[in-house]
Swiss-Prot record:
It comes from Blochmanniella floridana. The keyword Lipid metabolism does not apply. Belongs to the class-II aminoacyl-tRNA synthetase family. Its cofactor is Zn(2+). Keywords: Aminoacyl-tRNA synthetase, ATP-binding, Cytoplasm, Ligase, Metal-binding, Nucleotide-binding, Protein biosynthesis, RNA-binding, tRNA-binding, Zinc. It catalyses: tRNA(Ala) + L-alanine + ATP = L-alanyl-tRNA(Ala) + AMP + diphosphate. This is Alanine--tRNA ligase. Signal peptide: none annotated.
Amino acid sequence: MYKSIDVVRQEFLDFFHKQEHQVVPSSSLVPKNDQTLLFTNSGMNQFKDIFLGLVKPSYKRVVTAQRCMRAGGKHNDLNNVGYTECHLTFFEMLGNFSFGDYFKDDAIQFAWELLTDSNWFGLSKDKIWVTTHIEDDESYNIWVKQVGISTKRIVKIGNKNSDLYDSDNFWQMGNIGPCGPCSEIFYDFGSDLKGKPPGYMQGLGSRYIEIWNLVFMQFNRQLNDRLIDLPMLSVDTGMGLERITAILQGVHSNYLIDVFKNLIVDISNIMKVKEYINNRSLYVIADHIRACVFLIKDGVVPSNEGQGYVLRRIIRRSVRHGRKLGVNDIFLYKLVNLVIVHMNYVSNILYDQKDLIEQILFNEEKLFNNTLKKGLELLEKSLKNLNQDKILSGEIAFQLYTTYGFPLELTKDICCERNIKVDQLEFDQIMLTERRNSKRLSQFHKNFNNIILSSYAKTSTFVGYKCFSCQSKIIALLQDNELINKMCDVDQESMVILDITPFYGESGGQIGDSGYLKGECGVFKVKNTKKYGQIIVHIGVLISGIFLIGEQVFAQVNRLKRKDISVNHSSTHLLHSALLKILGSHVTQQGSLINDKYFRFDFSHYNAITITQINEVENLINQQIWDNLLVTENIMLMESARNIGAIMLLHKQYTEKVRVIQIGDCSIELCGGTHVSNTNEIGLFIITKEFGIGSGVRRIEAVTKNAALSVIQNKKKLIQNIAQIAQSDDVNLLNVIHEFKARYEKLDREIKLLNSKQEIQKVLSLVREVYYIKNVRVLVNHVKNMESSSLFKMVKLLKHYLQSGIVVLINIRKNNIAHIVISITKDLVECNRIYAIDLIQYIIRSVKNGKGGGRFDFAQLNINNVKNVSELVIQIQSLLNDIICNIKSIK
């Protein structure tokens, strides 16, 4: 029975909605507060804290159609995309979840009914195979005795290599924590395709395809590998939307389902590619443009690390496949509208950011175009010179990566098409040397999270919205990542957890509170406050006495610091609203930092903000401050917040009930931070900096209150000091500076003219030193203490005079450092294959203490401790003589 992808998605949601599941929208592709994941890669990610016991579920039964990415980290399908029928970087995962409600029986019955009932998907029962874990007799019996599946089509799967719980049918979140057996459901495409049934380790082929995984979380794995029963049994299932759609549409490839087929046809029309059937490059581009659009929509921008680097890799892989199809113009941005049209169920949220997405893609492709051609030339040359082992060195791959922006995957992709391997071990070793300080999760966080997991029943209640102090009880003490009953070590960093606290835990960009905890026998100085799930942790040092579990303490927040933080937090809301009004609706928050000194606000926008726009923003916000607008807080249902147009952050995951902060009639935003009660408390607002931090992302830094007044006073003082130096008053200062500038520019032109005449005289004198090796004009000479720009200009002039030849200039700098520049005319490079970069390498090997690099026609290096420049000149002349004399094409 043919069903469109939109119908399949909706029927899945409708089926489980009828089974009393709450339909929860897809979360962002960027996981919220989860450093273990690069991207959301499954439906359960947004419920991870529920499975860990850190957050109580709003609903017992949930169903989602989650947008996912698998193009980085542990789950990385990027290299397979376009070359297999099922791999995608961006896809949707259909899933139903139970949090302490139904378990194996209902989960299996639900899956069977949806797949086989003629009112739903209507698949043939004889086409369905199932695997269960070898020790999960309960699931096996449900499948056989209740569902009625033939024992010929159900397989028990054991552990791999006898490793405990290492099985395709045993799911675990990590080495410790929630885990359990799973039932995997497969579809048999029939005997026309090759492949062995599920359970075989080899020769799987493509006949049997996994379509759904039902995970039953029933155990908590301990450090000693012992499994203990979880107090709350849960179900987590996942089924790829594109994969089940392919089955329902009678095709064996994700790229042949309706959404891809239509998208590929339209892409081929725009790119003017005639052959679009089984065109692997079009498959790559169709997949990648979907990934690009949704990543940028969720706030990711191209960069050199993390999520931004994955996006950059995807864009550059797309561009390279465009070049394979003969498209040399910038094209990716033209495809954005096609994604919006064909992903019409989310077209509204995409269309609002269409211009931003197109601009970011245009800028990134333009940037890559500048180096793509040169990088391909280097790669082509390197591939031609390979030995019989057909392995490209990791050094060349790293040079392509650092100099020409070729992600390693792109280099491997190109090499793979020619059956050439890349020495990834060498590449990784070079990368490791370059990045010894790469970021890793600290052992503290790992240990601390384990502690939280073992005591997740404890929670902290935050009361700091209404008060700055309260009586509290100590419910946990930590020192050296260990839970303790008594704290007596003074000045040692420690952590205190209270049942009730006025201290705000760092979140939403707002820093944590500081202050004091005072007990009967001790005083604890709180330096910072952090939030882990529902637990608020006070980090600091005991400054006197002792603290005990169960002891009553008086918790006192630093009131003045908190008030300044609240002023800045409310100001970010005013800034966000002002940017939307002045720059446009495409503006979305990308991040923030809010402390008591200043705040910064990152947002999506593709151009620098003009001084006029900055003035407009400042004027609007200051007027709102002086209008004495009320700041109100309301707790309401998420749906109600949407209906009143509250701003919601893309990366944030919200509960059923949300806190809404409204400032007059100019700002409504979901927020958990602390705020002023009236805008007049802000006093004054001034933007101090505005700059770009990535492709399509700008940052504003701003100050308020006394800090803003200090900025004005400091600028006034600076103007007065400049006026004093210029011997002018404030009124005429600008005219005086213009006069100074005009005089400077006149003197600068005269100096440059004089230098130019001297350079020409020097060039003419050097030309007289030209000699021949065979028929090649050669100039090797030296100069002293010349600026690099002047040196390069002189080399260019010498090449012009020679018309054909090799120029080598040695610039002797201070401390006896020789800066050698080699430039070769185009005819010698193309006809006789004399390369400047090769000559540099010869010199480096000869002198043994040089370092440099370059291109075919231009290269340079530095040599330390040159004591005799004349000997160096002779040495290079001799080297050139040997090289040129051995080139047979030169007579």
